[in-house]
UniProtKB/Swiss-Prot annotation:
Top EC class for this record: oxidoreductase
Keywords: FAD, Flavoprotein, Oxidoreductase, Toxin
Protein name: Cytotoxic L-amino-acid oxidase
Similarity annotation: Belongs to the flavin monoamine oxidase family.
The keyword Heme belongs to this UniProt entry's keyword annotation: no
Coiled coil regions in record: none
Record organism: Amanita phalloides
Substrates-to-products reaction catalysed: an L-alpha-amino acid + O2 + H2O = a 2-oxocarboxylate + H2O2 + NH4(+)
Cofactor entry: FAD
EC number: 1.4.3.2
Entry annotated with the keyword Oxidoreductase: yes
Length: 143
C-alpha cells in the first residue's frame, strides 16, 4: 500500500512531484565491480574457474564440485523446483506448485538448502543437502 503513494495525485502536484523523485535500483550492471576475498573484477570480465577463491571459504566439504556447478546453476535448481510449478499454477488454475511449497513451509530458504534440498543430477553434486559453507558462499553471490 505504501508504494501507491507514489501514484497518489495530491503528492504529485506543484513542487512536490513525489513520483519524479524515484530513482531506479539496478542490481547488476556490466560496468560494476564484483569484490570478494580481496579480489576485484569487472562484472562483465569475470575469469573462469575460482577467481574469488571460494575454495578458501568452503571448508566444511570438498569445494570443487560446488564451484564447478556455480552459484547460478545451484540457486536455479534450489528455487526452480518451486518457481516452475508455481508459474504452472498461474497458467492452469491448479495448486500443485502451491501444495509443494506448503510442504516445505516450515523452512526458510536457508534451512531448506541445509536440511531438505537434494541437488538435481545434472549438477554433479553430492546427493545430500548443502553444507553450511556452501550456503554462505551462495548467499554472498546471490544478486
Amino acid at each position: 500500500r505504501v508504494f501507491h503513494l507514489f501514484d497518489y495525485p495530491p503528492l504529485n502536484t506543484g513542487d512536490l512531484q513525489l513520483k519524479a523523485k524515484i530513482k531506479p535500483f539496478i542490481f547488476t550492471s556490466n560496468n560494476s565491480f564484483l569484490s570478494y576475498n580481496d579480489v576485484t573484477v569487472k562484472h562483465n570480465d569475470v575469469p573462469a574457474g575460482d577467481p574469488f577463491k571460494a575454495s578458501a571459504v568452503i571448508k566444511d566439504t570438498n569445494p570443487n564440485p560446488y564451484i564447478a556447478a556455480g552459484v547460478t546453476a545451484i540457486l536455479n535448481d534450489v528455487l526452480g523446483r518451486f518457481a516452475v510449478p508455481l508459474m504452472n499454477d498461474l497458467k492452469t488454475g491448479k495448486t500443485d506448485g502451491w501444495d509443494l511449497m506448503m510442504k516445505y513451509d516450515k523452512h526458510s530458504t536457508r534451512s531448506y538448502m541445509a536440511l531438505a534440498y537434494t541437488p538435481s543430477d545434472h549438477l554433479n553434486l553430492p546427493k545430500k543437502p548443502l553444507p553450511t559453507d556452501v550456503i554462505n558462499w551462495l548467499e554472498t553471490f546471490d544478486k
